[in-house]
Amino acid sequence: MALSWVLTVLSLLPLLEAQIPLCANLVPVPITNATLDRITGKWFYIASAFRNEEYNKSVQEIQATFFYFTPNKTEDTIFLREYQTRQDQCIYNTTYLNVQRENGTISRYVGGQEHFAHLLILRDTKTYMLAFDVNDEKNWGLSVYADKPETTKEQLGEFYEALDCLRIPKSDVVYTDWKKDKCEPLEKQHEKERKQEEGES
């Protein structure tokens, strides 16, 4: 489902710096090997806010999401393993993302079309954001991710600052709830299987 991708892991159109000159933390920068190292590993989808009412309504269906990024610096791809809880059910998905280093974007093909999102690295190394449709005022949106399911007020500070810059009220923010996660048992099963495969090889 394309919308699931949009809401949890990278999508929509590129961010245009010229249209947001006052939003310092929304200015895209090239993706380097250091950037890829920084986003390697396990991440949790924390919250998002969209001006598009349809998207805002859909994110409310997402109870919890976590995923793993495994970048390939040579091929400029990222292997994604995603665990998402919707309607008290765990949905597991794997795919490859493409990295556009100079543009600071990551993309994925959905329904034969390539969708993009800008990866925005924050001051706090344990968080990052994705910017959605910032060149389309009616559909502006942001999502924030962290290396733990719970975040501090300070960690969400840059996310809130960016929302203010885009004139998206905090009341539009939809948060996930880790207590509703149903995927942790499946993740543990996958980890056990991987360790067994490594032991046999």
Curated annotation (Swiss-Prot):
Tissue specificity note: Expressed by the liver and secreted in plasma.
Gene3D superfamilies found in the cross-reference section: 2.40.128.20
UniProt keyword Cell membrane, yes or no: no
Post-translational modification: N-glycosylated. N-glycan heterogeneity at Asn-33: Hex5HexNAc4 (minor), Hex6HexNAc5 (major) and dHex1Hex6HexNAc5 (minor).
Main location: secreted
Assigned protein family: Belongs to the calycin superfamily. Lipocalin family.
Summary of the function given for this chain in its UniProt record: Functions as a transport protein in the blood stream. Binds various ligands in the interior of its beta-barrel domain. Also binds synthetic drugs and influences their distribution and availability in the body. Appears to function in modulating the activity of the immune system during the acute-phase reaction.
Glycosylated sites: N33, N56, N72, N93, N103
Organism superkingdom: Eukaryota
Species of origin: Homo sapiens
Induction profile: Synthesis is controlled by glucocorticoids, interleukin-1 and interleukin-6, It increases 5- to 50-fold upon inflammation.
Keywords assigned by UniProt, alphabetized: Acute phase, Disulfide bond, Glycoprotein, Pyrrolidone carboxylic acid, Secreted, Signal, Transport
Gene Ontology CC, one term: extracellular region
Signal sequence range: 1-18
Protein name as it appears in the record: Alpha-1-acid glycoprotein 1
Subcellular location as annotated: Secreted
CDD domains: lipocalin_AGP-like
Keyword Transcription regulation tagged: no
